[in-house]
Amino acid sequence: MANIKQQKKRNKTNEKRRLQNVSFKSSVKTVVKQVKTAVANADKQKALALLSVAYKKFDKGVSKRVYHANFSARNKSDLQKLVNTL
């Protein structure tokens, strides 16, 4: 446990951000799974709609500094390749 007052404050904000990041990452994973399920079911319209949602979430994650830009680009590319197989 920290003894310095400012570090105690930082610990609170760090925990708050950590929980927000975990929640955000979970929502991104859910959308990615939905895209993969739509591709498995050969539902191109649904896959394309969910793909745009996934792109938006990945870009938002980069701007919020939850994800590194390369991680986001790699995942978006992989999802696009998957949807292009339809």
Swiss-Prot record:
GO terms for cellular component: cytosol; small ribosomal subunit. Disulfide bonds: none annotated. Residues 1-11 have a biased composition (Basic residues). Residues 1-21 are annotated as: Disordered. GO terms for biological process: translation. Pfam families: Ribosomal_S20p. Gene3D superfamilies: Ribosomal protein S20. Keywords: Ribonucleoprotein, Ribosomal protein, RNA-binding, rRNA-binding. GO terms for molecular function: small ribosomal subunit rRNA binding; structural constituent of ribosome. PANTHER family: 30S RIBOSOMAL PROTEIN S20, SMALL RIBOSOMAL SUBUNIT PROTEIN BS20C. Belongs to the bacterial ribosomal protein bS20 family. Binds directly to 16S ribosomal RNA. This is Small ribosomal subunit protein bS20. It comes from Onion yellows phytoplasma (strain OY-M).
